Design a protein with these regions (language model features):
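Interhelical loop and helix-boundary elements at the membrane-water interface
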Residues: 11-25, 73-81, 122-142, 191-206, ...
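N-terminal signal-anchor module of multipass membrane proteins
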Residues: 1-50, 57
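Transmembrane helix-loop-helix
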Residues: 43, 47, 83-120, 210-249
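Core segments of transmembrane alpha-helices
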Residues: 25-31, 88-95, 140-148, 204-220, ...
Length: 280
């Protein structure tokens, strides 16, 4: 067997890489926000990025392996899933060990919730209960939001309470995004645009989340606790939620179109957050 054929047999995209492409933004948004907030990118920051991405990628082959063992996937997927699982684990552990050697051992505390959610996710897969678990997805985005304080602390070289503020701010946005995404997917099942009262009723949770976020951040910015311009990215998400809930429901829209729109809004949020946090 040639090297090319070995690579082609091992690199099976749906096993090696996550297929829910929208999840990438929930990883890189907090990571980039934390890195830019620290305003100091070091070799330790690069190692942290490698460790975080490895941990994120680990979920896909682990999920495939559980599905293969439970009969939901072909048993032929199991060896490939094992290969990627051990590769990501090796890279992640080496990166984590390097961070500990450099004096960032306290980051291990941030990994504890991630380990718990990871095994809970695998349990749900084994029970065939992983689909449409909005609560679990909100908790999972909270775990990914821990990348913000991790990147911030590594950039500073030490823990700082402001890292927890970044974590909370990022998680608020991620949770609202998850709720809104579920609403847009629910719109797809409608045969006609709903009336205004109906649209408000089925979308009130998403409206509540984004309104709460906007009011909270605006109030904290007004008191000087947060940068004055930081409400802008939250206003963006709030306006998008109002528009998509009340005026342009995703009736009959393709999931890909919904995902792309969510990706664009989340990307704009991240860019605006970085700019307003650092320039205010």
């Amino acid at each position: 067997m040639t090297a090319t054929s070995i690579r082609s047999s091992l690199f099976v995209r749906h096993i090696a890489l996550p297929q829910d492409h929208g999840s990438w933004v929930f990883l890189f948004s907090p990571l980039l926000i934390g890195l830019f907030a620290a305003q100091n990118f070091t070799i330790a920051s690069l190692i942290l990025v490698i460790a975080v991405v490895s941990a994120f990628l680990l979920r896909q082959p682990a999920s495939i392996a559980v599905k293969a063992r439970s009969g939901r996937r072909s048993s032929r997927d199991l060896p490939i899933a094992r290969f990627w699982f051990f590769l990501y684990s090796f890279v992640g552990l080496v990166s984590l060990g390097t961070l500990i050697y450099l004096g960032f051992g306290y980051l291990l505390y941030l990994a504890i919730p991630g380990v718990a959610v990871f095994f809970w996710h695998l349990y749900l897969i084994s029970r065939r209960l992983e689909r449409r678990q909005m609560g679990i997805e909100i908790v999972a985005t909270g775990v990914l939001a821990l990348a913000a304080p991790a990147a911030y602390w590594v950039g500073l070289g030490h823990p700082d309470p402001q890292g927890w503020i970044l974590f909370g701010l990022v998680w608020l946005q991620s949770a609202a995004s998850i709720v809104y995404a579920y609403l847009r997917l629910e719109h797809r099942r409608l045969t006609a645009p709903p009336s205004f009262p109906t649209a408000f009723r089925i979308g009130r949770r998403g409206l509540l989340y984004t309104t709460f976020n906007t009011v909270l951040v605006t109030g904290l910015a007004f008191t000087g606790f947060l940068p004055q311009l930081l409400p802008l990215p939250y206003v963006l998400q709030w306006v998008e939620t109002i528009w998509g809930t009340l005026f342009q429901p995703a009736v009959g829209a393709k999931p890909t179109a919904i995902g792309i729109r969510q990706l664009v809004i989340s990307t704009l949020f991240t860019v605006l957050f970085i700019l307003t946090w650092n320039l205010s």
